[in-house]
UniProtKB/Swiss-Prot annotation:
Keywords: Cytoplasm. InterPro entries: DUF2129. It comes from the Bacteria. This is UPF0298 protein BC_3932. It comes from Bacillus cereus (strain ATCC 14579 / DSM 31 / CCUG 7414 / JCM 2152 / NBRC 15305 / NCIMB 9373 / NCTC 2599 / NRRL B-3711). The lineage of its organism: Bacteria, Bacillati, Bacillota, Bacilli, Bacillales. Belongs to the UPF0298 family. It is found in: Cytoplasm.
Amino acid sequence: MFGQRQSMIVYLHSLKHAKILRKYGNIHYISKRLKYAVVYCDMEQIEHMMHKLNKLPFVKKIEQSYRPYLKTEFENSRPDRAKEYDYS
């Protein structure tokens, strides 16, 4: 039902234009102090959206999130203490 989504961090010159970013995806978070917005869009359209957003005059730079490409399943680095003292 839902496609894969990916986030991009859009750095802005001014937050006055942050509402315009709604056209390009779902706004997840806006930082007033650091002047950036986290915008989610479909993975298939991420390159196209980044190209369109770079053309806007109020955008400083855009960074793509690499979370979909990272391994998020971790192994336990320390052994379980309860299993260490199993005497049976």
